[in-house]
Amino acid sequence: MGSVTGAVLKTLLLLSTQNWNRVEAGNSYDCDDPLVSALPQASFSSSSELSSSHGPGFARLNRRDGAGGWSPLVSNKYQWLQIDLGERMEVTAVATQGGYGSSNWVTSYLLMFSDSGWNWKQYRQEDSIWGFSGNANADSVVYYRLQPSIKARFLRFIPLEWNPKGRIGMRIEVFGCAYRSEVVDLDGKSSLLYRFDQKSLSPIKDIISLKFKTMQSDGILLHREGPNGDHITLQLRRARLFLLINSGEAKLPSTSTLVNLTLGSLLDDQHWHSVLIQRLGKQVNFTVDEHRHHFHARGEFNLMNLDYEISFGGIPAPGKSVSFPHRNFHGCLENLYYNGVDIIDLAKQQKPQIIAMGNVSFSCSQPQSMPVTFLSSRSYLALPDFSGEEEVSATFQFRTWNKAGLLLFSELQLISGGILLFLSDGKLKSNLYQPGKLPSDITAGVELNDGQWHSVSLSAKKNHLSVAVDGQMASAAPLLGPEQIYSGGTYYFGGCPDKSFGSKCKSPLGGFQGCMRLISISGKVVDLISVQQGSLGNFSDLQIDSCGISDRCLPNYCEHGGECSQSWSTFHCNCTNTGYRGATCHNSIYEQSCEAYKHRGNTSGFYYIDSDGSGPLEPFLLYCNMTETAWTIIQHNGSDLTRVRNTNPENPYAGFFEYVASMEQLQATINRAEHCEQEFTYYCKKSRLVNKQDGTPLSWWVGRTNETQTYWGGSSPDLQKCTCGLEGNCIDSQYYCNCDADRNEWTNDTGLLAYKEHLPVTKIVITDTGRLHSEAAYKLGPLLCQGDRSFWNSASFDTEASYLHFPTFHGELSADVSFFFKTTASSGVFLENLGIADFIRIELRSPTVVTFSFDVGNGPFEISVQSPTHFNDNQWHHVRVERNMKEASLQVDQLTPKTQPAPADGHVLLQLNSQLFVGGTATRQRGFLGCIRSLQLNGMTLDLEERAQVTPEVQPGCRGHCSSYGKLCRNGGKCRERPIGFFCDCTFSAYTGPFCSNEISAYFGSGSSVIYNFQENYLLSKNSSSHAASFHGDMKLSREMIKFSFRTTRTPSLLLFVSSFYKEYLSVIIAKNGSLQIRYKLNKYQEPDVVNFDFKNMADGQLHHIMINREEGVVFIEIDDNRRRQVHLSSGTEFSAVKSLVLGRILEHSDVDQDTALAGAQGFTGCLSAVQLSHVAPLKAALHPSHPDPVTVTGHVTESSCMAQPGTDATSRERTHSFADHSGTIDDREPLANAIKSDSAVIGGLIAVVIFILLCITAIAVRIYQQKRLYKRSEAKRSENVDSAEAVLKSELNIQNAVNENQKEYFF
């Protein structure tokens, strides 16, 4: 019910916001009157005019008066045409023409607006586009609707480009309507206090709207408080708006009672900014200009105890709850409404509800501060000083985002040298230099590139130099030498002119980009209007009477928590520690599933998973168990066995499960998986799951759908049964669950919950443990998921005219597309989506070129990646494209990515409206022939297979994965196709695992052996295709490949022995002196050929690798990858009737040479690994039998790892992956080696033996102990009390169930 109420409130908020926006913007159908045509001639002005007949008064649209339009005297970017609308109006559209019947027209222009005729502001589209496209001829009309509209009195058109064969020429019209404005001017000491009737106040709803403008960066706009510390405050701080809400005791702040929201930036620009605050219950909208923040307040927000008064512009009395520093607002407020009440109108009428404190006026004063914008690093302002005083002094204010740049340079008169004032790393530095003398430096301020206004004062007099920043005097420095300093030189602000002008100006760190104002030289304020008109000083690339700074980090286009920083012309994203990369932190560095990690060749371990790729969900850590199928294992906090007593329907027990991921992350992971399951075990003693009399559930569980579920493990939602009920083997056939038999003894119902739409389990409720001797216990396993529906989702396109279509792709500001393809065609379009003018297209342009082309309004761009090899090789290739605010990029496979920077201040919105075509185009031409797989757009997978099933000439699925992924199968493993994906067949490999990369090793104790009998194998497999059948006695073996590794310290030792029925043999031994010997006897009438490697002691306890490759009489031998030898046999070229292969001790050793016999009698003690003779792997056959292999094992042979160092347990280096406990350090990309070492296993084993010997317990007790030991190892962090309780319960369960066949043994 709460969620429904929240949704309703949110909808009402949205509707009220839309209504407010309509009021703010005006009704577009009623606000489109022409505003220029009826204006008097005096309303038009310009920078200059070519002649009296080209004056600004002739610039009316469609008029032919005079010369047919306005043209300036000189065509350059400093010209402008200005319109005075007489009063503030709402302007909703503009239209332009060129000069009538001429070659004079403007092709692009800026539109600026102002209330006072100075301090102009540029109008921007899409929050970044400053320029309007103009005309292509003299007479056609180009019309633009302004969204949002402009509220201003003055408009100024500034031509940027014009017809290169003519000059600037303009005729214009603007459209709009009258604008209602009620204003109040507050001087920084005054405020308004509104007291309202309690009856008129809604307890759950508040709407406050206003506009403000100011030159101050700090001030209180509104404040309302209560007696207990509750308050709502809207405060301007550092030119940003903060909404502060405290809904609890101010002395005890907490995250549930404090709200601190920030919106807006650079709000002290003396231009109007709109604010809207809407509260409906706990739903709050906070809007500043076009930026909106919606949030759901926590705590008792809708029950705030506030007084029945609200102040605007300040806090009139000492606040009972305000502990933060604050000052009153200095500026103007407009159209101030509180819950529909016009506050300014009430104040004008001097109504008793309004108390005006201080000097309050109802007209807005216009401070005549004229800023100047330095647009580029080439900008400068050169001003003369004619005062001739014995002092060099200047003051000014500046604001910028750049860390470095020249602020001021002045030459010294009568003596050579100069004074430099510049920014370096955000600090202000002053430098006075004279030739032949060391410079005198002063450093002041920090982080002065924060976009705020900063004041600077410079003074150099006699032998003293001082600098002040924001009123703080920096350390003064004595000047070098007794020379007197005189003013009268030229002051260069912001940069230096070209050297061709003969200037001595120096700019060590480049020019300044930013704004300056209030410039004074020798105590006299500089008249910038005179500068603009050319009568004072000189300048280049300036915008006078306007500050064009903008905050490129608002809104923050850095995604996924990336930190935004900026300079004058661009922004940068720091993606450190976000888990994402790219220009805007859009691309996840993690895979989306364990399946994807597996097909990169990764082994079992911990990995970060990003289920929705570049989508909003954060990555999270889980465990991937890489078996033949990749299993995703997600843990929760309820893995302990939990006992429950003393519950009933009136007093139920509820257990909650919290997972390592959020519910949204879990849902994305589950939806992506092919299959998910959770094992649930319910132990019971007189505790039922269902009341048989009325069918009422006595226990139930809840999943992610928040619905009650009464089916149990092994069953499905439509059958309220347990596993035994489905299998028909419950302990009481009258019931469908063991626990429903209600017996006074422990039993259980265990099974898998596998209906993934209901998973994971989030809650368990138990109500039937309140009777005598009644008790229950439960244990929930981790969430296990396998497969990836998206990774293999694919479609095959049969003709060039075939395609799949999907809804329009929405990636206005940030878009990424990724997919796999394979083809034999030389070209074809993978994907295309069109708009009215915008589009994106990805295609195979030629066999070696993939191209990404797009247009977002700045003209078409293309990015191509060329490969040295062909893409149409029928192998899978991966394509990823991205387009964002900063750049577009294309990467194919592992080739170097290609990028295309976005144009500065260009169009940014990708606006598409057609269907998305996959595998073809709307024209049904240049379609793609081949397969496309795993197509994702902004992290969301398109279901190609589902759409292909209903589309002609397109087939669901693709085959031929082994051509691309076969290389993942190692050590002789063979890639086999599956309907979805592939697998590695390790049948004829000495290795195992999903990629045949896990070596099979064994520790051989003294006197032990493994014997593989080929003749018996032939009898078993002569009708099969087994490669072992090739060793039949009737066959002659002219070649073999032998590989293995070993570690030992014993001599002599027999490593490997192969014999035949004709007394031929091959032996690999370590002689008494530690040398390795390989003996071939391929003719029973000759002595064996002996190859001796005596370069080192091979029984040194280190791991050694042996490879023997025989081709008839030539044998190639390699030892440890660095010792190689080739020998020619004299005893024969064929191995006839192979009998057996022996590892370790030879039980029958007649007819062999003495050294082999001695080594064979001794056998082998140590570790052997990955033993393979051609396609026979004897250790694998012995330790991992898949069918009745003819293998005999004698003595102590145990699976181990040869990677262990001497003196340690042979298994201590093995990776152990337990579902219940995965601990250790975490690497972002590679698996985590488990910290559970086998030392504990060895100790546990010894303890088990001691207990067995001392107590002589039964086999059942041994199993109980093993369960307890394994459980203890997997749950090492559990408290002793929990361990004890579980051990007792397990003992009860196992002793009782030793005679109960229905008891399921469950442990990891």
Swiss-Prot record:
It is a single-pass type I membrane protein. Residues 587-792 form the Fibrinogen C-terminal domain. Residues 212-364, 398-547, 793-957, 1046-1202 form the Laminin G-like domain. Disulfide bonds join C31-C177, C332-C364, C515-C547, C553-C564, C558-C573, C575-C585, C931-C958, C962-C975, C969-C984, C986-C996, C1167-C1202. It holds the Pfam family F5_F8_type_C. InterPro entries: ConA-like_dom_sf, EGF-like_dom, FA58C, Fibrinogen-like_C, Fibrinogen_a/b/g_C_dom, Galactose-bd-like_sf, Laminin_G, Neurexin-related_CASP. Its main location: membrane. The chain crosses the membrane at residues 1242-1262. Presynaptic protein involved in both dopaminergic synaptic transmission and GABAergic system, thereby participating in the structural maturation of inhibitory interneuron synapses. Involved in the dopaminergic synaptic transmission by attenuating dopamine release through a presynaptic mechanism. Also participates in the GABAergic system. This is Contactin-associated protein-like 4. It comes from Homo sapiens.
